[in-house]
Every structure is written in structure tokens, then in C-alpha cells.
Amino acid sequence: MAEHGAPAPAIPNGGCAARLPGNKVTVVLGAQWGDEGKGKVVDLLAQDADIVCRCQGGNNAGHTVVVDSVEYDFHLLPSGIINPKVTAFIGNGVVIHLPGLFEETEKNLKKGKGLEGWEKRLVISDRAHIVFDFHQAADGIQEQQRQEQAGKNLGTTKKGIGPVYSSKAARSGLRMCDLVSDFDEFSERFKVLANQYKAIYPTLEIDIEGELKKLKAYMEKVKPMVKDGVYFMYEALHGPPKKILVEGANAALLDIDFGTYPFVTSSNCTVGGVCTGLGMPPQNVGEVYGVVKAYTTRVGIGAFPTEQDNEIGELLQMRGKEFGVTTGRKRRCGWLDLVQLRYAYMINGFTALALTKLDILDVFPEIKVGVAYKLDGEVIPHFPANHEVLSKVEVKYETLPGWDTDISNARTFDELPVNAQNYVRFIEMELGVPVKWIGVGKSRESMIQLF
């Protein structure tokens, strides 16, 4: 310690230099209300990745990946697991429904060879919380109550996501480490939690002993996959050079803090959720790619300023085959909203964008883009936090000429019609973020890379 007011040495302990930050992770996030095509971007990047991670959400997410003409659906697993060389990591911020996890693997194994050997390539954080069947049942009851009491529900996926994050925040939840450590102790805590739920929801039926029997069987299967997640990530970041990819679920406008509350999910699906959901510091975040559909869609209810509840919306819905992967619900469709995208950029600091489904706009003679919101005739400077205000905004549009050409066979930017190129450049200029990929179809080959 420095004496008599003398300055301390510049380097702590006189010679301990700061550690090198280690490997960077590449993050892929949804920039709208979900369903932007994140799985496709991840699939592209996962081809030479070493580790692919999920950091938040549960099996309420839905990612589709097409490999060798086989369409795989992922809800809980990182979709990058389709690469046989990849280690998939489910972080502590994810909530895990064990029956859902094994059902997902079985369904995908029947479709093709993409998931072979998955058990040896999956690591699950011991700090991840477990979704129980009664969480899912409670989710359904809560939705029913909202409908009866307020005349509208939140439109949840009924996958138990809200209730399990509630248990986590109330500190009554159970984690993977509890399941695989001492099953007797786990069983006692499970009974307490189940009885709490029965007290809150008298109509809820829980076969406690039956559930525990099933959970014990899952425990045997999952135990080899459960590891200390913090140590796993630290080793991955500070060991030999590795390409680490983080696959965000849901999207910016569904974030519990920054989304169109209350019509949101229950986790942080913006860039901050990467650090808290994996147990890693922000200096290890590298590229942050925002995935943007060339128009806008939303599942369920909630404000949607650029929605086209007309023939335009129907045409977008039909051409884009806009149905939710998890719920099968029709997606609401509308024009691209740059006010909303600027807001998503402010929170996430996207380093580049992936613009997907540009080919869906092929048939429109002119294309509108929302560039500002007005309230009582005045342009408002920010994306409103209040849902009622957002519901009332009037959108100011910029109209761009369409290209009336099938672009699905384009493989370079120069092969796109001039008006399609101008549409992409307009988005870049308005947002101040470069577009790195343009999607013009379903296959891997139909992602045009610009740089």
C-alpha cells in the first residue's frame, strides 16, 4: 500500500498486467417481432463454427433450417447443431422443458441425418431453470383468465415461459443442477412448488408422483450433458481460438424490457441477454448481426403501426407463407418500419444486417417503408414505450418503386434489379447500418453475401 500520500503504482500489484479478452462471440438477433429468419443466418454462420449457443427463452422460439432439401424445426436446441462438428450450448438464461427437448430431437432425427450424435454434442448449463408441465398448464389458465377479465389475452405460446421465469424471479424455481445433484432433495422442492401452483390455480391437476417418475427418467438421460456453464464459457473464450456463435430467440420488440410491453416474451432477447444468459463479459461480444425481414410481421395481438389489414397484408401473408413455427398461427403482415428498426439498433448496436425474404416483395408495383410516426399531426422523435400511444400513431411512409421481377435466382447483388438494389441501399442509409446478407429464397444458396 502506498504510504504518506504517495501515488500507488500504475499497475495493480506492481506488475500484474490485464488479461487478454479472449475469443469474441458473434451474435445473431431478431430486430423486429420475431420470425425474421434468424435460423437461416445462423445456419450460414454455423458451417464453420465450433460452438453455437442459446442464451434466453425456451421452446417458445421457432427456427427452421433447410439442409439437403430437408426442413428441420428447432425450438429449444440451437439450430446450429445441424453442423456435425458443432458443440451446442444451452445457457443459464434458457428455460428447459425436458419432454419438449427430447420430442424435438426425436422429430428431427426422423427427418434426416442432421442431428445424429446430438447427445454427445450438447452441453446444458447447470444453472438453467426447468419448465414443468404445470408451468405450461398455468400459462393456459392465465391466458384464459386474461380473456375473461380483460376481454383480451397476451397471445402466449402456452409453453410455460412466463410462469417459469416468474418462479425464477420469485426464487422458487428449480434448476438443472438441482435435478442432477440430489433427486430426493429435488423431489421435496418440486412438491412444494407444485403445491404452491395448486393453491394459486385450484383447477390445476398435477400428478406429483407421476411427474417425478418421468423427471427421474429424464434426469438419467440428461445428466451427462449438464455442465458448469460459467466454466464452460470461460474455457471456450480463453482457450484456443474458436468461432463461437450466439443464436438469439424471439426478437428486440418482444424483449421483456424493451419490447411492446405487455405483449412481449419474458426474457431479454436484446444483446444484454447474451452476457447474462451465458455468463460472459461484454468485452467478448464481437459482431452483432440484426436479422430484418424485408417487410414486417407479428404473431398474436399487440400494436403494429405499419400493419396492412387489407389485400396488401393478405398478399404478403400468402407469398411469405407467414405461419408461426411454434403455434401455427397466421402472422399479421405490413410494410417495413424504420422507426422500430432504429429503436432496435439503439439497444443492440448492430454491426451489420441480414435482410431476408426480399423476394416476397417481387410482385408489388410500389413498396412503402415507414420512416416516421406522427401523433396528433406532430412527428414524434422516439419509439413510444406506452402501448396505448403506439397503438394510436400514424405512420409517415416513403414510397419506393417495385421491381416486378422474380429475384429468387439472383446470387450476387449486381444480379438484383436496380429498384431492388435501391430498396436495400435506402434501408442502409436510413439506419446507418450496412446490409451484409440478402435473402431471396429458402435454401442456403439463396443468401446473397455483400461483404
UniProtKB/Swiss-Prot annotation:
One of its GO terms (molecular function) is magnesium ion binding. Its cofactor is Mg(2+). It catalyses: IMP + L-aspartate + GTP = N(6)-(1,2-dicarboxyethyl)-AMP + GDP + phosphate + 2 H(+). InterPro entries: Adenylosuccin_syn_GTP-bd, Adenylosuccin_syn_Lys_AS, Adenylosuccinate_synth_dom1, Adenylosuccinate_synth_dom2, Adenylosuccinate_synth_dom3, Adenylosuccinate_synthetase, AdSS_2_vert, P-loop_NTPase. Inhibited competitively by AMP and IMP and non-competitively by fructose 1,6-bisphosphate. Pfam families: Adenylsucc_synt. Binds 1 Mg(2+) ion per subunit. It is an enzyme of class 6 (ligase). GTP binds at residues 34-40, 62-64, 331, 357-359, 439-442. One of its GO terms (cellular component) is cytoplasm. HAMAP family: Adenylosucc_synth (MF_00011), Adenylosucc_synth_vert_acid (MF_03127). This is Adenylosuccinate synthetase isozyme 2. The gene is ADSS2.
